[in-house]
Amino acid sequence: MVAWNNAAARPSCGHMNLSWPWRFLRLVAAAGWLAAHGGSLAAQDVSKDKPLELPTYTVTDSRELPPPEPWFYGRIPGFEVLSNASEKSTKRLVGDFQRFFLALSLVWPGVQQKTAVPTSLIICGRGGKFDTFIPTGQQRPNRAMASLTLRAAEQSAIVIDFQTKVLNLSTSEGATAAVSTAAAAEDGVSLGGGDPGFQVDAYRQLYREYIRFLLGGVEPRGPAWFEEGVAQIFMAMEVTNTTIIVGKVENPNTISAEQGALNDAGISGTAPAEDRDFNAALAKRRLLGMDELFAVTHDAPEANNALGGTWAKQAYAFVHWGLYGDQGKHQKAFITFLRRLDREPATEALFKECFKQSYQDMLFTIRGYVEFTNYKIAGVQAGKGEKLPTPPPFELREATEGEVGRIKGDALRLAGDVAAARTAMTTPYIRGERDPQLLAAIGLLERAANDDGRARKFLEAAAQAKAARPRAYLELAKMRFAEATAKPAETQARFSAEQTVAVLTPLFTARTQTPPLAEVYELIAEAWARSIITPGTDHLGVLDEGVRFFPRTTALVYATAVQKVRVGLVADARSLIDLGLRVATEAETRRKFERLQASLPAAK
């Protein structure tokens, strides 16, 4: 592990431990899986013996089904890749991303988590496809956006605009108004009258979006300015065969290759601007007030349209100053500030307490840091004669209609366009596609649309085909639970053994897949609470597993405590009640735990 101390971009040797000690970035290591004990419930899931008849979708208007779209498909660790760029361009972009992914794992170990539900990486290379994934409310004629993350629960997608090479921006920084027109060809350049625009580097935008994706999945989530600042730092990370450098900023006096070529040729005019580091981007701009910087939320236009924006570059400058500025001497105050923001709002009083500066003082500090950036660089250096690890080859093939429909449909659903999502998913289904993952996706779409009849059939079929999608098993279990609740087979509204098995079977499948879902464990507890069968201690071990994964989910903690009382494990119940009282934030929740505590026999 090596570092460089920079003054006016002249490196000298030094050492530091590259670590990210912020509490809300520390990913909790999950406990090992407990074995699933069947016990008296080791019965066959009776639903597997029932023949399934899948629903029929009928085209009722005069329009024909849209023709199949040519896309490529591939997989890398943690991602399904869907691209309509050329095969060569896709392999180049994904191969570069794999190197970035591997480099990030070396300098920031533990931040990348494995999941059975891979994130979709959608590369839009032609046909203006990127715009179809922009959520309603974020669409604007002068978008400064070339990438976006779509997320809901465990489902997520990163979408990259690989078609647009230049965005013509109408910004407060002085660009003249011009309508952005994307080129029809993949490698085209979009230019508009009067505004030279900003170059779009899809590679760097993918780096940025991936960091924002990682940080957006951490709880409690950090502030938007911090996510953007860290993303900008890693967007500029340099990776070679032997070295990874984090935190280095460019020489602000350099010009782009395109501008240099124009100058050398004696051609007047301005080339499209590059998306530069903060020391160049902010050199001639008015800074935002610190209160303005901190007020921007994750879904604000400034955060979603960061390309060329002052907010993004000032966030970059402030985070870089806090982590690397003046040889890293501000790190302690900066990290203290971040930790305090977990539990209190950003105020000038808090800021002064941490940094011993007012907001206005910090603007002068940032201005000075932009003009003369004295900082420490961090990184990794391979040993003498060695090279850093290289990623495995990336295989690409033509995507099936089912893969295209499922991946696009899921992303469109995440973007809020349910109608387009249904069209994308059902079109390949009507043509005969029966891929288990597609069936699961359609089932979840219909479930969200409250069409439980269709949803049940698709989810049953997906479960029989062993689809890898824990949410599908959870929703199937919820429908079976509702069915058993409506018609309990035992007295006192209790579930029979068969009904209990029917509910628990998909839940136990879901818990073998990642990511773990708190709702899975909550429904397991509820099923036991309704069952005629008293669970054994081995069965309740599954609930202990859930509490280890989700110690702050008070509904799960409470339900587990109730079941512990039911089987006589009073000491375990007391520990769970103590946990619930520590983490509960609502008065009524605390009262529930207190009532349960009062019902316990006196401790001996």
Regions found by a protein language model. Name each.
Residues 428, 461-462, 507-510, 545-546, ...:
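Canonical positions in the second alpha-helix
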Residues 444, 478-485, 492-497, 508-545:
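Alpha-helical adaptor scaffolds
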